[in-house]
From Swiss-Prot:
Name the UniProt record assigns to this protein: DNA primase large subunit PriL
Species the sequence originates in: Methanopyrus kandleri (strain AV19 / DSM 6324 / JCM 9639 / NBRC 100938)
Functional description taken from the UniProt entry: Regulatory subunit of DNA primase, an RNA polymerase that catalyzes the synthesis of short RNA molecules used as primers for DNA polymerase during DNA replication. Stabilizes and modulates the activity of the small subunit, increasing the rate of DNA synthesis, and conferring RNA synthesis capability. The DNA polymerase activity may enable DNA primase to also catalyze primer extension after primer synthesis. May also play a role in DNA repair.
A GO term from the CC aspect: primosome complex
Molecular function terms from GO: 4 iron, 4 sulfur cluster binding; DNA-directed RNA polymerase activity; metal ion binding
Subunit structure, interactors included: Heterodimer of a small subunit (PriS) and a large subunit (PriL).
HAMAP family: DNA_primase_lrg_arc
Coiled coil (UniProt feature): none
Alphabetically ordered keywords of this record: 4Fe-4S, DNA replication, Iron, Iron-sulfur, Metal-binding, Primosome
Cofactor: [4Fe-4S] cluster
Lineage: Archaea, Methanobacteriati, Methanobacteriota, Methanomada group, Methanopyri
Amino acid sequence: MRSWFPHAPTVSVPEIEPEEALSYRDEIRTRVRSYAFGLDDWRAKVKTRRAYLRKVRDEDESEILRVYGALLTVAAAGPRPVRHLIAEGESAMAETALYALRHEDESAMSYPEERVLSDLYLWDVRVLERDLGLYAVHFSFPLIHRSPEGQKLKVLVWERASLEKVLKEVRSNRVLGVRVLDPSGWNDVWICPRCGATRRGGTGDLEQDHARRCSNCRGRMRKPDPNLLEMLKEPEGYLIMHFKTLARTFREDVRRLVVSDIESRDDVEDEELREFCLKLFPKVRKRLERVEKGAGGRFPPCIRELLRRAQEGENLPHEARFALAAFLVNVGWDVDRVVEVFSNLPDFDEERTQYQVRHIAGEVGGGTRYLPPNCDKMKAWGLCPGKDCGVKNPLAYYRRPRADDG
């Protein structure tokens, strides 16, 4: 399993044989239902997920992990998009638990809900270990507050602290940012204040070592926001973000970890498991066929690559989303079909995405249909795979005559 911290302890998710995975099918159905994929109302989704968290918090811990292992095995036997739906569901439940811990009163810290959050979602992302029933942070864990008296920053740093202590501070509305530090200084996790991306390592110089090298912001963030720099006078190098950004980054880390764990079981080939998986997610096959059918040889390499990344649930930067959506609407895809392409992204919001795609298509706003960026701009944004296609715009690649056109 990929980790920002190579030497961090991990919770062992048990390997499950296909036959045993099938024996957990009822509990897996319950877990999948808890994701509430079919519910449109966000509050209903959160309510459903929290109900499931309450259900499992009193279960035996090893049994919870076995059910989770069975879920990963089922996902590994199904079509590729399933693993990203599973990962999105797990990350959504993790985020729900994180918000629950933030907003509950202090007595909530004694509830097993903390155990569920830590064991299933935080084992690698925030470097936790079990120690006499507590969870300790291996690296120092700073939390940056805005003091009630004014604009000064208050920084709390623990070399070791129980998760209980850290989350008590995280629940405070005064928290502005978090950075996880390695004592050596070379395994620090930096969180980009613009896009929420995480990156490991560095010298500690915010502008030179992070802002200009963030792959998601390449080409558009030449230096940090001046307002951000003003807040970084003490101590220099800390990145500031609001709790929503922390939650989004945390959710993306969880999603990546779950996908990685599922992919480690890629050799699972069991027809019964596969059929069970397809019954759980009947729309997966149709969605996959629709996306792949449109991504034929006429699509340029850059667009095929962006389609692949979107289908796999990668958190695409804004420029990549715009380029992909603008290309698809200009080759005749309808709005709903384009929105469907982005549905696996970790921060997918159907209503917002539909509005943005309609705006690109010229259906709302000023009525202007936007063209995809030209190849020079795609290269500047880091979206060109490097192959010289001999055109100046992705649409030219799509429209040029081919031998099989007759």
